[in-house]
């Protein structure tokens, strides 16, 4: 299956990634991606960018090397109430927002607490994607999360790095989540979570799961850039962007 976008990527600005914005955009162009999202870690992650970094996205062009660039953040959920580590006046102006649970930012809790954190963050109108919800460090009630995602029109991310270098043990959880998304008709978005340009657009391990359960193409956002851009525009974002 051909995928044309990857919106979960990091640059050197995140502190533990290895390539620049231009290097990422150039690589995305070379492999034929049409949309690239830069979603740096929120400020509570050690060595993440200062909040001014996110304010200043406005200086960046919408296209680099012919690739449509989305300027966003992987915000950190900082408590079980679903609060984030970026103020609303910044979050509301980002092109795309992924909300994730990370151990340096919120202590893993019980299934009920972890689930509450995700359910609560989905009430935030500026959150677009739940990042790597299959992380075994944060066990959740996946069915509740998927049902809430459908109710709130939130995308569920399946994260390729969860099967390679991070969050070891995610395969069973992610498989269950994909099955539930298929059952309930919830859109998923594939993310590379690249911290170096060479993994951008690589969803090889995710593809094995998708093939094993015959996931409908219609529920995979990455197959058509218009699916994503239309979705974001429906939430009041990307006001400057004209969809061809």
Curated annotation (Swiss-Prot):
Binding-site list for Zn(2+) 1: 8, 10, 74, 193
Residues involved in Zn(2+) 2 binding: 16, 41, 195
Residues in the signal sequence: none
GO MF annotation: an example: phosphatase activity
EC number: 3.1.3.-
GO cellular component: cytosol
Details of cofactor binding: Binds 3 Zn(2+) ions per subunit.
Enzyme class: hydrolase
Essential cofactor(s): Zn(2+)
Residues noted as binding Zn(2+) 3 in the record, renumbered to the chain: 74, 102, 132
Protein name: Probable phosphatase NT01CX_1282
